[in-house]
Amino acid sequence: MNKTITPNPETLDQKWYVIDAADQRLGRLASEVAQILRGKNKPTFTPHMDTGDFVIIVNAEKVVVTGKKSSQKLYRRHSGRPGGMKVETFEKLQARLPERIVEHAVKGMLPKNSLGRKLFTKLKVYTGPTHPHQAQQPETLIVNTIPTGEN
């Protein structure tokens, strides 16, 4: 009979990856990042544990969406007060806080529980090509989110 192996949290190897979001499709990029944060790309994946890696996303202001989503996609937030609903389009939010667009997309693809909140802290999003995590010696990860007609 096979035995179920649970990875030891102390011995897990958590790597750091850098992903360039320039000219990448938002949803496809977010789904790839969510899988890495969750650890689904590793043989040690366990649904109830944090087995994923850290992800740094640079050039968040250059992420793109297809179709008319740049003018029609809405981001909503509420202050909690009566009449406190704020609505912003993709274009306006990208001009104001481009990191929040990528964070919002990835957060929606993580579990909606305490594990998901813990995994979300392992995502670092920056505008521009630089980041302050050189000490962690992150690996560059190439993500191709532009679909081609080849199957």
UniProtKB/Swiss-Prot annotation:
One Gene Ontology molecular-function label: mRNA binding
Keywords: Ribonucleoprotein, Ribosomal protein
Superkingdom field: Bacteria
GO CC aspect terms: cytosolic large ribosomal subunit
Gene3D superfamilies the UniProt entry points to: Ribosomal protein L13
Annotated GO biological process: negative regulation of translation; translation
InterPro entries referenced in this protein's UniProt entry, alphabetically: Ribosomal_uL13, Ribosomal_uL13_bac-type, Ribosomal_uL13_CS, Ribosomal_uL13_sf
Pfam families attached to this UniProt entry: Ribosomal_L13
Subunit structure comment from the entry: Part of the 50S ribosomal subunit.
Protein role: This protein is one of the early assembly proteins of the 50S ribosomal subunit, although it is not seen to bind rRNA by itself. It is important during the early stages of 50S assembly.
Entry's family note: Belongs to the universal ribosomal protein uL13 family.
Name by which UniProt lists this protein: Large ribosomal subunit protein uL13
Organism: Rippkaea orientalis (strain PCC 8801 / RF-1) (Cyanothece sp. (strain PCC 8801))
